[in-house]
Swiss-Prot record:
Free-text comment on this protein's domains from its UniProt entry: The PRC barrel domain binds ribosomal protein uS19.
Name of the molecule in the record: Ribosome maturation factor RimM
Compartment(s) of residence: Cytoplasm
Gene name of the record: rimM
Summary of subunit composition and partner proteins: Binds ribosomal protein uS19.
Gene Ontology terms describing biological process: ribosomal small subunit biogenesis; rRNA processing
SUPFAM superfamilies: PRC-barrel domain, Translation proteins
Lineage: Bacteria, Pseudomonadati, Pseudomonadota, Betaproteobacteria, Burkholderiales
Keywords for the protein's UniProt record, in alphabetical order: Chaperone, Cytoplasm, Ribosome biogenesis, rRNA processing
GO cellular-component term (any): cytoplasm
Length: 225
């Protein structure tokens, strides 16, 4: 399955999610041993080239400076990146910050975390509205049959007869499986060039190979479907 598609696949604004859901238990605080480290919120001097938006701060959590993050993917479906990454980048309007994360854990369908330098509820509450980014290199490794959506965006799609079908422009999660949005050049009713879209289920019966190195996906799908 896959996580939520943010609909913005530009560099540094990529959508996020994994293909196959795996159950993950996060009863214990991740990396709790780092809680004694010191740090603070800092203005982001450099924005990572591989920054991927993974959620947004929606509320304070508790009284000791923890924040609650609504994630674009649940734990086990890609949201684990928030639990693994020890450094987050935050954006709200023109304001950009970087912060070290002391502790984090899954909480219901959200992630709660303690940013370094945020010591009380008021300071945590003031962080509402920040969009949360982590580096792609901080994503947890996936099994051979799993893919992050961010890695599929822009790949060429061809069928088994090597007919070009377009490029992956986005992904949709319909609650049962993922669906690729494949854009291709077309001609409008007025004869002018336009862009059309194919929707191809991202399931094994249709998706035969995903070659990220070659940036190509081979599917069992005809051009006139």
């Amino acid at each position: 399955m896959a996580g939520h598609d943010s609909g913005n696949a530009r560099r540094g604004r990529a959508s996020f999610g994994a293909f196959v859901r795996k159950p993950v238990e996060r009863d214990a605080v991740a990396n709790a041993g780092q809680a004694a480290e010191q740090g603070s919120l800092e203005e982001a001097q450099a924005w990572p080239d591989d920054a991927v938006e993974v959620g947004a701060v929606v509320d304070a959590y508790g009284l000791k400076g923890w924040v609650k993050v609504a994630t674009h993917a649940d734990a086990g479906r890609g949201g684990d990146a928030l639990l693994k990454a020890r450094h987050w980048w935050l954006e709200r309007g023109a304001e950009r910050l970087s912060v070290r994360i002391m502790q984090s854990k899954a909480h219901s369908d959200t992630v709660v975390a303690q940013p370094a330098g945020v010591s009380d509820r008021d300071a945590a509450f003031a962080m509402r509205g920040f969009r949360v980014f982590v580096r792609r290199e901080d994503f947890p490794a996936l099994a051979a049959d799993e893919f992050y959506w961010v890695d599929l965006i822009g790949l060429d799609v061809v069928n088994e007869q090597s007919v070009a079908l377009g490029k992956v422009s986005g992904m949709i999660d319909n609650g049962v499986h993922s669906i690729m949005r494949v854009e291709y050049p077309a001609t409008g009713k007025d004869g002018q060039p336009t862009t059309d879209e194919r929707l191809i289920p991202f399931v094994g019966v249709y998706v035969k190979t995903v070659d990220q190195a070659a940036r190509r996906i081979v599917v069992d799908w005809e051009a006139d479907y």
